[in-house]
Amino acid sequence: MKKSWWKVPVYCMAASWVCFQMEVHFLGKWTIVTLPDGSISSDNTRWVILSAVLFLAVVCIGGFFFFRSMTRKEIFFSSSALVALNIVLGIFTYLTQRTFTSFTMFWIELSEWGSVFSQIAFYLGLNEWLSAAIAWVLPPYIFLLFGKKDIPTD
């Protein structure tokens, strides 16, 4: 196996930062609605749709352009590195969010790409920790769909 364990984490963090910037500075404006009483709010349905579109874009770009040449085994180990990082830093930011607010915001920027899963889980009424576990674990393994099958060597 090539030393490719870092590819999924680096790609996903870079894509997350880009997604976060796009949501905050450009695309988030699409979700703003004026309510009948004149107040301004964010439409959660539009936000979930926006997050889903960005997620699909990240998955397709990563799968077709960055991970297509990797085997499923390589993608699995690389994705597992990201999952471990998500779990450790996710719990750390949860426990220290009042103390290390700037780190919490930084980690949010670097883990934004899979946020659609936690948004859907909240929409379905799942508990906070279950939705966090889904968002931390499931998205990186979607790249397995784009990997090559392992060719056994004799």
Task: Please describe what each predicted stretch is.
Residues 11-22, 77-101:
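Hydrophobic alpha-helical membrane-insertion segments
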Residues 47-74:
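Canonical alpha-helical transmembrane segments
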Residues 28, 32-36, 67-71, 94-106, ...:
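Transmembrane helix-loop junctions in multipass membrane proteins, especially transporters and channels
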Residues 102-123:
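Membrane-interfacial helical/loop segments at transmembrane boundaries in membrane proteins
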